[in-house]
Amino acid sequence: MQTLETTSKSNPGEVKAQKPSTRRTKVGKACDSCRRRKIKCNGLKPCPSCTIYGCECTYTDAKSTKNLKSNDAGKSKPTGRVSKNKETTRVDKDIRKLEQQYVPINANIHVGPRFPSENILNGYPQCGAPQNNVVGNPLAVNTQCHRGLSETPMSSTFKESNLRDDRLLQSSDTDDMRNGDSEERDLKGSDSENVKSKDNKSDPLIIYKDDTHIESTVNKLTQAVNELKSLQNAPSSIKSSIDAIELQLRNILDNWKPEVDFEKAKINESATTKSLETNLLRNKYTNHVHLTRFRIWIDYKNANKNNHFMGECGFSLAESFFASNQPLVDELFGLYSQVEAFSLQGLGYCVHLYEPYMKTEEAIKLMKETLYIILRFIDICVHHINEESISIANPLETYLRKKHLMPMTPTPRSSYGSPQSASTKSLVSKIIERIPQPFIESVTNVSSLQLLDLRDDESKMFGTLLNMCKSIRRKFDSVMSDYDSIVTEKSEGEQNDGKVTVAEFTSLCEAEEMLLALCYNYYNLTLYSFFEFGTNIEYMEHLLLLLEEQLALDEYYGFEKVLNVAVANAKKMGFHRWEFYVGYEESTAEKRRLLWWKLYNYEKASTMKKGFFSVIDDATVNCLLPKIFRNFGYLDRVEFLENIQKPMDLSVFSDVPISVLCKYGELALTIVTSEFHEKFLYADRYTSIRNSAKPPTLKNQLIKEIVDGIAYTETSYEAIRKQTAKLWDIALGKVTKDKINKEDTAAASKFTLSYEYHRFRLINMADNLIARLMVKPKSDWLISVMKGHLNRLYEHWKVMNEIILSMDNDYSIATTFEYYAPSCLCLATQTFLIVRNMEMDDVKMMVAVYKRFLNLGMFLQSAKVCSLADSHTFRDFSRSFSFITIISRLMIIEFMQIKELTKVEFIEKFSEVCPDLADLPPMLLDPNSCLYFSLLQQIKKSGFTLSFKKILEDARMMDFNYDRNLDSEAIKKCNGEFSKSMPSCTNVSDTTTAVSDNSAKKKASMGSARVNSTDTLTASPLSGLRNQTQLDSKDSVPSLEAYTPIDSVSDVPTGEINVPFPPVYNQNGLDQQTTYNLGTLDEFVNKGDLNELYNSLWGDLFSDVYL
């Protein structure tokens, strides 16, 4: 590198040999553009400044430059730096020093091509010429093409840019750069969890190639930017240097990725049984990788080497965790589920957070009771889903057996070939004849005789049955909105006033179940039918009606199956592409559009709710939006996303009917949220498996891009709220509701809750993604951002409570469960435990909302409708009611523990501030109260409870086999004793190894609080649900004898029960004669010392929680 002194000597005739002259001579080598702007130039062509400004980089001949300077000498003073005789300030000296230090770095920077600056959410830009606004807008940082910044391969890009050249790392003569190694260590130490960074070549367990050159380059550039930014009153030339260095950092982020050493990978294949994906998470920067907030992977091998999680026996306790041998992501909870806290990992995380508050025996008992109730709840959920899977596979037989109208014998899956089949036709007739008439005919205008005449016409029968279901559902909603209208008998004056008798209401519910069974039967019959041109649209309308009915009944399993069929058919028919609309009449085209966007809304909402990836790729959807969107100036999805944030005349929304405005708002929210999902939550840029092996600085840059994406999406949400302001006025009671019918009021309230839920879920899911990229120690900026996110969750929850308490009837509140309950769970397990303490006003609000749910719950348990307890509608509401009961209990316990109140003290305080609700907290805190009645009834064991004993055995065997102080004979002896002591979970502490003793000491503060029945939620891990997909490929379905109705036995079992093992759970590898029972609540709470099992399942997995 040419020094300043040699430069001045090479031009002795131009100016005196002093530093100002040297500076001016160096400017003579600048390009014309930099000279014109009076900024630094490195002499390259093109130079970084011209690249940034997007202008042509030209250089004037040296002689002409010299002549120009000579001619201008008498007209103006020299433009060089301050002479030696003039004093300079400290800032000027610092600036000069840094310029000398980092200009050589800029000279070696390879400035790759940049794309035009545009927002990340506007899609992937095409390669183009550099623009002058690359640096500026925070979102513009993320405008690069995610699939590569240039067409040059990554390796060649960095060869050309000389990133491996020592000159780039040692380009300064200053002491600071000479001591760069120590500064580099300091920088890495502050960013990478205090895990000593080492060469990948030195660790045989890491299968990535060495990235020291990239790591050093990133650290040098980051340090340069930080020092330049720390200067006060810096001139524009410094800003130009900062922009150039940040551009290079982004270039590295966009183009470089950790390279896999496939030779190492082959060697490691024989050394481990773990998947290659698991091994690819191992890297030199961190021993922990969060797939989500709750799902944490630990590098046990490197943890051992760094003495992390080392037990007194000399081996890694973490390696014996049950959780370490299970997939982190299970099929029930998906990747971004809102109820992830009820998974195996989630429960461990929550128990860890509650641990500091579990200081008394009462607190421990409350927590164990809660975990027992949660386990029972999950068992019931799996039981219901199993019933649904059987119902849709064999709908006619299932219904008739349930009503004891068929022998309870195993029957192979029906062979649906023709409705003329004698057996199928007979079963259809048998169900039709049981439909309660003439009441159902008065509701649907269809008689049983008409159904018998249509039974051979599959398509017409399917459509007729679905329309009947729609009419019955509308009648049911009307009755339930004022359930006081259900009377024992009608008087003469009540014949036409909208009231119904108990018998009529019972007929309504029973008829809906019969019709649903018939609908499933004809769905199976028409599934593989060929429809002539023109009739396929009618079939799609039928599928949409079936989906509506399943949503109303919360048919989890059946809805997913029908939805997949409907989406596949719609895409095959080209509903999502404009090309398939050319030539249609506009009326037909609009019908197709409405069907597609309704299906799109269903599919996106379902996958978002469950945490799954959508099967609809937005990049392939280019059909026009429905008419309501076009009326507002949005032609298609892309145009809507581009213009939603632009100012517009909001008066155009004032005359839109409420029902239409609700549909517009729902689809608008779905489109905006889906865009965020595809650009961030599932984008390879942020979820690539290689991200775990990237330097912390690059991870932090990705986090900043996600935070910017959240802010942009929230701005779109705010725009939608302004457009739908009329609905908010209705929901919050700012408009006289007498002028609006009940249906519109309920629709407005439901939409506003949906809006708050979208805002809630956006933050929650984005935080899960951020957790994957976080490094330790967390910066103050990141901690501030995450706390802000969690506080915003609280604000959205408060708005939800206000909306619910403003609703007219309890039944309408019950229909909002899908939005409210998951939000409460996230709040209870995150915000109130991490960033803010719950106050009494929060408890009052939660109990007041619960009271509204409870009113309907008490009605369902009344003598009027107790005979309907096993119907679809009431069973599903009972499940929802149980969930909200558990959440309310959790929040009360959380408040008690944070405020250090006993149960008696809390009840007294609550009674003083809220006497009208004083009767509810004692019931919520008493697990034997009527609120938990449905959870404590007997059901046959699901995959959770059946696998629980196996988990206990495996966890204990792990500890024995890893204990180096036990010889093989001792192990055999202990194993024999252990197998004798395992009749139930209440005897898990009889034989404890030295290892588990040591583990228990670490958790001594919890006493016997480690209630590990939580593992049954995902234990093996979700065997019941994982086999659901196998139903379609097998020749038979599980026998109905394997299941017992929930209400068939009133007493909770107290001992072991020999239960036939359902084929659905065979993949667990459990003995089919395995029996296990949770026992009674008292046994579980009073006899179960599960401290050791907590350590076996989770150990120190949550020693470093997310925030």
Swiss-Prot record:
Stretch list, region Activation domain (AD): 968-1107
Coiled-coil intervals, chain numbering: none
Annotated spans, Disordered: 1-27, 66-89, 149-204, 999-1022
Cellular location(s): Nucleus
One Gene Ontology MF term: DNA-binding transcription factor activity
DNA-binding segment(s): 31-57
GO biological process: cellular response to xenobiotic stimulus; DNA-templated transcription; intracellular receptor signaling pathway; positive regulation of cellular response to drug; positive regulation of transcription by RNA polymerase II; regulation of transcription by RNA polymerase II; response to xenobiotic stimulus
Composition bias, Polar residues: 1-11, 1010-1022
Compositionally biased spans, kind Basic and acidic residues: 175-204
Segments of this protein annotated with the region DNA-binding domain (DBD): 1-296
Result for mutant: residue 1083 to Q: Gain-of-function mutation leading to increased PDR1 activity and fluconazole resistance
Effect of residue 822 to L: Gain-of-function mutation leading to increased PDR1 activity and fluconazole resistance
Factors inducing expression: Expression is up-regulated by fluconazole and during biofilm formation. Expression is also induced by oxidative stress caused by the antifungal drug, benomyl. Expression is regulated by the regulator of proteasome expression RPN4. Transcriptionally autoregulated through a pleiotropic drug response elements (PDRE) within its own promoter. Expression is also up-regulated by clorgyline, an inhibitor of azole transporters. Expression is negatively regulated by the J protein JJJ1.
Impact reported for residue 584 to C: Gain-of-function mutation leading to increased PDR1 activity and fluconazole resistance
GO CC annotations, alphabetized: cytosol; fungal biofilm matrix; nucleus
Motif (9aaTAD): 1091-1099
Disrupted gene: phenotype observed: Leads to hypersensitivity to cycloheximide. Leads to an 8- to 16-fold increase in fluconazole susceptibility. Also leads to increased rhodamine accumulation.
Subunit: Interacts (via the activation domain AD) with the mediator subunit GAL11A (via the KIX domain).
Free-text note on domains in this protein's UniProt record: PDR1 contains several specific functional domains including an N-terminal DNA-binding domain (DBD) containing the Zn(2)-C6 fungal-type zinc finger; an inhibitory domain (ID) that may be involved in the negative regulation of the activity of the protein; a middle homology region (MHR) that probably assists the C6 zinc cluster in DNA target discrimination; and a C-terminal activation domain (AD) that binds to the KIX domain of GAL11A for recruitment to target promoters. The 9aaTAD motif (residues 1091 to 1099) is a transactivation domain present in a large number of yeast and animal transcription factors.
Function: Master transcriptional regulator of a pleiotropic drug resistance network that contributes to the azole resistance of clinical isolates and petite mutants. Regulates the efflux of rhodamine 6G. Regulates both constitutive and drug-induced expression of the pleiotropic ABC efflux transporter CDR1.
Stated name of the protein: Transcription factor PDR1
